[in-house]
From Swiss-Prot:
It is found in: Host cytoplasm; Host nucleus. Keywords: Cap snatching, Endonuclease, Eukaryotic host gene expression shutoff by virus, Eukaryotic host transcription shutoff by virus, Host cytoplasm, Host gene expression shutoff by virus, Host nucleus, Host-virus interaction, Hydrolase, Inhibition of host RNA polymerase II by virus, Manganese, Metal-binding, Nuclease, Phosphoprotein. This is Polymerase acidic protein. Influenza RNA polymerase is composed of three subunits: PB1, PB2 and PA. Interacts (via C-terminus) with PB1 (via N-terminus). The keyword Hydrolase applies. Mn(2+) 2 binds at E80, D108. Phosphorylated on serines and threonines by host kinases, including human casein kinase II. Its main location: host cell. Belongs to the influenza viruses PA family.
Length: 716
C-alpha cells in the first residue's frame, strides 16, 4: 500500500501526509491504510479549492491554469495540510478579519464567498452515516459539511454543494480512479474495511485478457512475463547496486566504494604565493564618504548636483601626489585624471546653470586609462583562414595567490553595525491572508536587525553604482561620462543624508551582447594608508589628495586623505545582477526563516517573537580556528547577509566551482556526523576538483579556510 500511495499521489501531498502522521505519532509503515486515507483527503481538499477565484465584483469564477486572471483572490483558504500551530493561526486570523465564529475543531477550508468554514469528508462507507458522525462531532451549524464517497455519492449541509457540478464531478472521478487502482492491486478491500475496523479478507485478483497482455508488453527489457518481474522486484536488494552499475559501464572503470571515517578527510590545500589582492568593483571597509545632512539644495537628487554639494563640505584639498604607484600602470596618467576631474568640476561650478550630466574631455590620460583604441583590430575570419600559423591569443596562467588577513577583516567589518539606516522597505499594504501576519512580523524583525548593517550599505552602494553605470552605458555610448558614486541613508535621528564616495569615469560602451565589457576608471576617497598593506592594493594607484580633521575625545586630529584610482571593467550582465543586489536581503531572510520554522516545529507553535526577543540565547554563526563561533540572533542575521553580499561582490567562476564541489564534500561529512556510514569512490578526484578552484580569489580562499576549520571541529 505504501508503494501505491507514493506512486499514485503528488509528492507534495505524500510529504504533508507523512508530516501529519508524524505529528500524531503514527507509523506510516504500519498504518498504511491511514496513510492512503490522509493522502486522499488532502487531494480532495486541494481539488475542491483549485481554479476557484473571486473577481473584483465579489463573484465566484473558475479560472483554468495558465490564465492571466490567476492573480485574482483565491475563493478558498486551505487549512488542511498545515501543521496544527499554523492552521490555528490561520483560523484565528480569519475569525478576526471576517467576524466568523471560531470552530471547536480544525476545519479543512474557509470559503470567502459564502463566509463559512467547510469540513470535507471522504468515506468508504455510506455517505449519510459518515455525515451524521461528522455533524455529531462538530456540533456547529456554522461549519458547512460536505462528504464524498468512492462510489460517486455525496452529501452536504442543507443540500448546498458549494461547487458547480463540473468541479464536483472532477473530485468524484478522481476518487473512483483511486478505487480502481487499489482494486487492481488487491488493496481495495483492506482499505475499504479498515474504516470500519472489519477483518481484512485477502482476495487474489487475477489479471486476464487484454490487461494481462498490456502488462506483459510493458515490462523492462530482459523480463518475459509479469511473474518474473514481480519475483525480481520482491527479491531486489539495493546493496551493491552502485558497484554493479559502474562495472557495467566500462571495463576500464574499476570503482570500489571506500568507507568514509573521521580520519579519512584531509584539509583542503590552499595555494602558496604572494598574498591575494582586492578585486571588488568599489572599496568596502576602506571607503570614505563626504556627506550632507538634510539636503535641500537646488537640483537635490540629481547626482552631479549632489556630488558638487558634497565636495564643497571638504576644505582640506591639497596638491595631489602618488603615494603608492601601480606596478604596471602609467601612474602620472592616474594623477592627471584626478586633476582633470577637479578642474572640470570647477568649470561646472563657474557656469550659470549646472548641467545634469558631465562628459569628460577625451584627454590622452583618460584615453589611456579607459583603454581607448587598445582593443586588437577585429579581422573577418574569411580574410585570414588561409594563414598557416593562425592560433589562439596566448595568455599566461593566472598566478597562484595565498590567503591574506585583510579579507577576513573585510568580512568582519561587513557584519558590523553603522550609525545609519540603509534600507526603508516600501509599505506593502494591509495583511490579507492569515499567513501574511507572520510574514510581516518576520520581515519587520529581520529589517530591524540588518537595516544598520554595513553589508546593507554595500548593497545600496552596489545598486546605485551599477544602475548609474548601466544607464550611462546605454545613454552615452561614445562619451567619457563622469558618474558620482552616491548613496542615501538616514541618521539615527531620522535625518536624510546624501553620501559621496568618489567618482567613476565610463569609457566607450557599445554593449551589444550581455558579456561585452565597458571599461571605467574609479576614483574613491579613503583614510586608509595603502602602505600598511601594499599587497591588498596591487591593482590601484593611490594618491594623497588632502588632509581631513577628525573629531576625537581630546582635540581634532588631522589625517591624510587618499584617493584610490584604478582601471576596471564590467559587463551588461554583471551590472544587471549588481542592480538586483537587494536579493541578498531576501536570501538571508529565507535562511533565518528556515531556522525559525525548525524551532517552531519542535515547540509546536510559532516562535518568531521568542526567536528575536530572547536576547540571552546564542546561535552558531560559523567556524573559526577557535571552534564554533556563537552570537545573538541579530549577529546571525548580519553574518548571513554579509555572506550573501560577498557572494555577489566577489562573484566569479572560482566561487561557482568551489561552492559546487565543496558542497559534495560537505554532504559526505554531514552524513558521517549523522551516523549514515557514507562511502565514497575517487575522493582524490573530488579534492582535485575543489582545489583547482583555489587560484587567487580572496573570497574563495577565505571560504576554503573556513571549510578547513569546519572539518577540524566537525570530525573531533
Amino acid at each position: 500500500m505504501e508503494d501505491f500511495v507514493r506512486q499514485c499521489f503528488n509528492p507534495m501531498i505524500v510529504e504533508l501526509a507523512e508530516k501529519a502522521m508524524k505529528e500524531y505519532g503514527e507509523d506510516l509503515k504500519i498504518e498504511t491504510n491511514k496513510f492512503a486515507a490522509i493522502c486522499t483527503h488532502l487531494e480532495v481538499c486541494f481539488m475542491y479549492s483549485d481554479f476557484h477565484f473571486i473577481n473584483e465584483q465579489g463573484r465566484s469564477i473558475i479560472v483554468e491554469l495558465g490564465d492571466p486572471n490567476a492573480l485574482l483572490k483565491h475563493r478558498f483558504e486551505i487549512i488542511e495540510g498545515r501543521d496544527r500551530t499554523m492552521a490555528w493561526t490561520v483560523v484565528n486570523s480569519i475569525c478576526n478579519t471576517t467576524g466568523a465564529e471560531k470552530p471547536k475543531f480544525l476545519p479543512d477550508l474557509y470559503d470567502y464567498k459564502e463566509d463559512r468554514f467547510i469540513e470535507i469528508g471522504v468515506t468508504r462507507r455510506e455517505v449519510h452515516i459518515y455525515y451524521l458522525e461528522k455533524a455529531n462531532k462538530i456540533k456547529s451549524e456554522k461549519t458547512h459539511i460536505h462528504i464524498f464517497s468512492f462510489t460517486g455519492e455525496e452529501m452536504a449541509t442543507k443540500a448546498d454543494y458549494t461547487l458547480d457540478e463540473e468541479s464536483r464531478a472532477r473530485i468524484k472521478t478522481r476518487l473512483f480512479t483511486i478505487r480502481q487502482e487499489m482494486a487492481s492491486r488487491g488493496l481495495w478491500d483492506s482499505f475499504r474495511q479498515s474504516e470500519r475496523g472489519e477483518e481484512t479478507i485477502e482476495e487474489k485478483f487475477e489479471i486476464t485478457g487484454t490487461m494481462r497482455n498490456v502488462a506483459d508488453q510493458s515490462l523492462p527489457p530482459n523480463f518475459s512475463c509479469l511473474e518474473n518481474f514481480r519475483a525480481y522486484v520482491d527479491g531486489f536488494k539495493p546493496n551493491g547496486y552502485i558497484e554493479g552499475k559502474l562495472s557495467q559501464m566500462s571495463k576500464e572503470v574499476n570503482a570500489r566504494i571506500e568507507p568514509f571515517f573521521k580520519t579519512t578527510p584531509r584539509p583542503i590545500r590552499l595555494p602558496d604565493g604572494p598574498p591575494c589582492s582586492q578585486r571588488s568593483k568599489f572599496l568596502l571597509m576602506d571607503a570614505l564618504k563626504l556627506s550632507i545632512e538634510d539636503p535641500s539644495h537646488e537640483g537635490e537628487g540629481i547626482p552631479l548636483y549632489d556630488a558638487i554639494k558634497c565636495m564643497r563640505t571638504f576644505f582640506g584639498w591639497k596638491e595631489p601626489y602618488v603615494v603608492k604607484p601601480h606596478e604596471k600602470g602609467i601612474n602620472p596618467n592616474y594623477l592627471l585624471s584626478w586633476k582633470q576631474v577637479l578642474a572640470e568640476l570647477q568649470d561646472i561650478e563657474n557656469e550659470e546653470k549646472i548641467p545634469k550630466t558631465k562628459n569628460m574631455k577625451k584627454t590622452s590620460q583618460l584615453k589611456w586609462a579607459l583603454g581607448e583604441n587598445m582593443a586588437p583590430e577585429k579581422v573577418d575570419f574569411d580574410d585570414c583562414k588561409d594563414v598557416s600559423d593562425l592560433k589562439q591569443y596566448y595568455s599566461d596562467e593566472p598566478e597562484l595567490r595565498s590567503i591574506s588577513s585583510w579579507i577576513q577583516n573585510e568580512f568582519n567589518k561587513a557584519c558590523e553595525l553603522t550609525d545609519s539606516v540603509w534600507i526603508e522597505l516600501d509599505e506593502i499594504g494591509e495583511d490579507v491572508a492569515p499567513i501574511e501576519h507572520i510574514a510581516s512580523m518576520r520581515r519587520n524583525y529581520f529589517t530591524a536587525e540588518v537595516s544598520h548593517c554595513r553589508a546593507t550599505e554595500y548593497i545600496m552602494k552596489g545598486v546605485y553604482i551599477n544602475t548609474a553605470l548601466l544607464n550611462a552605458s546605454c545613454a552615452a555610448m561614445d562619451d567619457f561620462q563622469l558618474i558620482p558614486m552616491i548613496s542615501k541613508c538616514r541618521t539615527k535621528e531620522g535625518r536624510r543624508k546624501t553620501n559621496l564616495y568618489g567618482f567613476i569615469i565610463k569609457g566607450r560602451s557599445h554593449l551589444r551582447n550581455d558579456t561585452d565589457v565597458v571599461n571605467f576608471v574609479s576614483m574613491e576617497f579613503s583614510l586608509t594608508d595603502p602602505r600598511l598593506e601594499p599587497h591588498k592594493w596591487e591593482k590601484y594607484c593611490v594618491l594623497e589628495i588632502g588632509d581631513m580633521l577628525l573629531r576625537s575625545a581630546i582635540a581634532p586630529v588631522s589625517r591624510p586623505m587618499f584617493l584610490y584610482v584604478r582601471t576596471n571593467g564590467t559587463s551588461k550582465i554583471k551590472m544587471k545582477w549588481g542592480m538586483e543586489m537587494r536579493r541578498c536581503l531576501l536570501q538571508s531572510l529565507q535562511q533565518i526563516e528556515s531556522m525559525i520554522e525548525a524551532e517552531s516545529s519542535v515547540k509546536e507553535k510559532d516562535m518568531t517573537k521568542e526567536f528575536f526577543e530572547n536576547k540571552s540565547e546564542t546561535w552558531p554563526i560559523g567556524e573559526s580556528p577557535k571552534g564554533v563561533e556563537e552570537g545573538s540572533i541579530g549577529k546571525v542575521c548580519r553574518t548571513l547577509l554579509a555572506k550573501s553580499v560577498f557572494n555577489s561582490l566577489y562573484a566569479s567562476p572560482q566561487l561557482e566551482g568551489f561552492s559546487a564541489e565543496s558542497r559534495k564534500l560537505l554532504l559526505i561529512v554531514q552524513a558521517l556526523r549523522d551516523n549514515l556510514e557514507p562511502g565514497t569512490f575517487d575522493l582524490g578526484g573530488l579534492y582535485e576538483a575543489v582545489e583547482e578552484c583555489l587560484i587567487n580569489d580572496p573570497w574563495v580562499l577565505l571560504n576554503a579556510s573556513w571549510f578547513n576549520s569546519f572539518l577540524t571541529h566537525a570530525l573531533r
